[in-house]
Amino acid sequence: MSHSYSVPKKFPTTVVGSYPKIGPASEAIKKRRAGEISEEEFHRIARESIRMVVEDYIWAGVDIISDGEQTREDMVVYFAERLEGYREGDWVRVFDNVYFRKPIVAGRVRWVRPMIIEDWEYARSISAGRPVKFIITGPYTMLEWSFDLHYGDRRELIFDLARAIRREIDEALARGAEYIQVDEPALSTRPFKEEAELLKEALDIIFKGVGAKRIVHICYGELERILPYILDYPVDQFDLEMKNSNFRLLPYLKEYGYDKEIGYGVIDVHSFQVESVGEVKEAIDRLMKMDIVGPEKVYVDPDCGLKRLPRDVARAKLKNMVEAARLAREEW
């Protein structure tokens, strides 16, 4: 692929991963679940949706993009359906009126074949040289958001999940992946030292010897309670929700001497209100004035995935975010 695109050294812009389902993706998900189309046909149909997502990112000016996770009905279920050892579960309420089919671990979890490589590679082929993050749900979130009827031992299960995830990451690394992001939203729901340490052991398996940029995304919850226990994770960057919680975490980052890169969430993905350029710029200024890390370590992005927003709102939010980052480069 071409590497003609130059990612800014200060305040590069990126996304957490998901994007509103557009084009034929939603219908293709239903047809695949009903057994009306094959896995191969499913991904082929979804290419049109991925193309539209990438076009939106390029239009907005985002530097490091994703495939928009257009084939993922759910961040856990998608992988559970493609790993050996899982079977389908029943509907479980997550929050408000949001439900998902909580999968069941019924046997030994193993990687069988590439799960998200095809979508990611297609996005790379049409990205106009922009890097495309390889984004996968992490072992702790897979563990927490599944029913275990086989292992009876959380450590055994999370380590098998970590090995399966690493196998998928190896497929991406062999194809030149530059940014590897592991999503762990479940960690903030159990903000305890022992849970943070369990995930660290799993991440040691996932990231050992990985030369690409290693990123972990965590969002919401009381992350400040476990911040001291995650700072030594084998990662280059933590991608963090900030806007929705009114940047509550910033003083804690300062207190604990945070020095890794930060994916700095400046867009509230739960609000349909589009942040102004000035509002986003002010959020960036707020971080810089605290002198936690330099501008070369700040990746400007939304709090979380954009999938629950209308497409026009997502586009507008990204456009303003990119412009705010550009202005910040001129100042900082």
Swiss-Prot record:
Q: Does the keyword Zinc apply?
A: yes
According to UniProt, the name of this protein is: Methionine synthase
The UniProt note on the cofactor reads as follows: Binds 1 zinc ion per subunit.
EC numbers for this chain? 2.1.1.-
The family database entries (CDD domains) matched by this protein are listed as: CIMS_C_terminal_like
| Protein keywords | Amino-acid biosynthesis, Metal-binding, Methionine biosynthesis, Methyltransferase, Transferase, Zinc
HAMAP family with a match to the protein in the record: MetE
What is its cofactor? Answer: Zn(2+)
Q: Which InterPro entries match?
A: Met_Synth_C/arc (IPR002629), MetE_arc (IPR022921), UROD/MetE-like_sf (IPR038071)
Provide the binding site for Zn(2+).
H217, C219, E241, C304
Q: What family does this belong to? A: Belongs to the archaeal MetE family.
Q: Which GO terms describe its biological process?
A: methionine biosynthetic process; methylation
Pfam family of the protein (one): Meth_synt_2
A GO MF label: zinc ion binding
Its gene name is metE
Q: Which SUPFAM superfamilies match?
A: UROD/MetE-like
Q: In which pathway does it act?
A: Amino-acid biosynthesis; L-methionine biosynthesis via de novo pathway
- Asked whether the UniProt record includes Cell membrane among its keywords, one would answer no
Instruction: Say what the protein does.
Output: Catalyzes the transfer of a methyl group to L-homocysteine resulting in methionine formation. The physiological methyl donor is unknown.
Alphabetized PANTHER family for the sequence: 5-METHYLTETRAHYDROPTEROYLTRIGLUTAMATE--HOMOCYSTEINE METHYLTRANSFERASE
The taxonomy runs: Archaea, Thermoproteota, Thermoprotei, Desulfurococcales, Desulfurococcaceae
Per the record, the domain of life is Archaea
